[in-house]
Structures are given as structure tokens and as C-alpha cells.
């Protein structure tokens, strides 16, 4: 039992339709500004000497045992 002529024609038609749709789509590429390193707002990429990023969660040391802040 072989593949019917109808199935072969439908397969070729589907391949042609898919290739037409894929060739006519417009794809926008991601430019270099989207992939550069993060800079704070208002800082130019060339003059970032005065634009230092602040840490999101600065280090805060834990408390002493004498302060009894951890149930101790």
C-alpha cells in the first residue's frame, strides 16, 4: 500500500504555502543598544565616569548576640 496521489499533492501544496509565508514575514533584528550593558538613566555610554550604578541590595551586617535581634 503506497502513498495516495492526493496525499502527495497536499504535502507539496503545504510545503509551498509554508515557504511563501516564511519568506514574506518581516523580522526585526535586535540592535546593539538593546544588548549593551545597563546604564543608569541620563548617562551617556561614552562618559560614564560620574554615572556609577548603586547596588540593589547593599550589604548590612548582622546584629550582635547582645542585641537579641534573632531570638537569642
Swiss-Prot record:
Keywords, comma-separated and alphabetical: Disulfide bond, Hormone, Secreted, Signal
GO molecular function term, any single one: hormone activity
One Pfam family per UniProt: RALF
Cellular component per GO, a single term: extracellular region
GO BP term, example: calcium-mediated signaling
Protein's cellular compartments: Secreted
Disulphide-bonded residues: 43-51, 63-69
Top-rank taxon, per record: Eukaryota
Signal peptide per UniProt: 1-27
Physiological role: Cell signaling peptide that may regulate plant stress, growth, and development. Mediates a rapid alkalinization of extracellular space by mediating a transient increase in the cytoplasmic Ca(2+) concentration leading to a calcium-dependent signaling events through a cell surface receptor and a concomitant activation of some intracellular mitogen-activated protein kinases.
Family label: Belongs to the plant rapid alkalinization factor (RALF) family.
Name by which UniProt lists this protein: Protein RALF-like 36
Provenance organism: Arabidopsis thaliana (Mouse-ear cress)
Lineage: Eukaryota, Viridiplantae, Streptophyta, Embryophyta, Tracheophyta
